[in-house]
């Protein structure tokens, strides 16, 4: 839930106007909107590069994943792994635009550990792939923008652990 929605819901639940503190938080949210959109646009425009490079790094670091018997062995399973990385990158962009982790949590992280466990997917490898995406993505951004984006990647990585 964005800071705007959260503030309005809280104020309405108490039948009051928005407080000066809530208005300040909304003002900050609005003033950082252009930056958040710029970050999301950069990640979106570079998504293929980010996912491919992260996948290459993951498979180099974890060759067991793409070896016979590995969860991403074979062309089809490797493509499935890259599709999952792309999915998490998309969720990260949603969080960045919203300025909040709620879309990430509600759309894509509920039950994710259970799903991967049931499929026999090594969760540490998924987290490693997301960490690699974070590194590739952040290399495309300024230090300030990378810090902003990095926190959303970290949230997803944390959910995997």
From Swiss-Prot:
Binding site for (2R,3E)-phycocyanobilin: 81
Membrane topology: Peripheral membrane protein
Residue numbers of N4-methylasparagine PTMs: 71
Gene Ontology CC terms, in alphabetical order: phycobilisome; plasma membrane-derived thylakoid membrane
Alphabetized UniProt keyword annotations: Antenna complex, Bile pigment, Chromophore, Electron transport, Membrane, Methylation, Photosynthesis, Phycobilisome, Thylakoid, Transport
Record-linked InterPro entries: Globin-like_sf, Phycobilisome_asu/bsu, Phycobilisome_asu/bsu_sf
GTP-binding recorded as keyword: no
Gene Ontology annotations of biological process type: photosynthesis
Intracellular or extracellular location(s): Cellular thylakoid membrane
Modification after translation, per record: Contains one covalently linked phycocyanobilin chromophore.
Subunit record text: Heterodimer of an alpha and a beta chain.
Function description: Light-harvesting photosynthetic bile pigment-protein from the phycobiliprotein complex. Allophycocyanin has a maximum absorption at approximately 650 nanometers.
UniProt family annotation: Belongs to the phycobiliprotein family.
Protein name: Allophycocyanin alpha chain
């Amino acid at each position: 839930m964005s800071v705007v929605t959260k503030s309005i819901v809280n104020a309405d639940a108490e039948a009051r106007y928005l407080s000066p503190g809530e208005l300040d938080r909304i003002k900050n949210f609005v003033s950082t909107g252009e930056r958040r959109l710029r970050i999301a646009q950069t990640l979106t425009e570079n998504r293929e590069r980010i996912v491919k490079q992260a996948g290459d790094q993951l498979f180099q670091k974890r060759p067991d994943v793409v070896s016979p018997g590995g969860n991403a062995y074979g062309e089809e399973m490797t493509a499935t792994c890259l599709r999952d990385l792309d999915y998490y990158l998309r969720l990260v962009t949603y969080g960045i635009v919203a300025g909040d982790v709620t879309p990430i949590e509600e759309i894509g992280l509920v039950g994710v550990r259970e799903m991967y466990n049931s499929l026999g997917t090594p969760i540490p490898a998924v987290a490693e792939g997301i960490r690699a995406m974070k590194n590739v993505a952040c290399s495309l951004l300024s230090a300030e923008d990378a810090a902003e984006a990095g926190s959303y990647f970290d949230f997803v990585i944390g959910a995997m652990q």
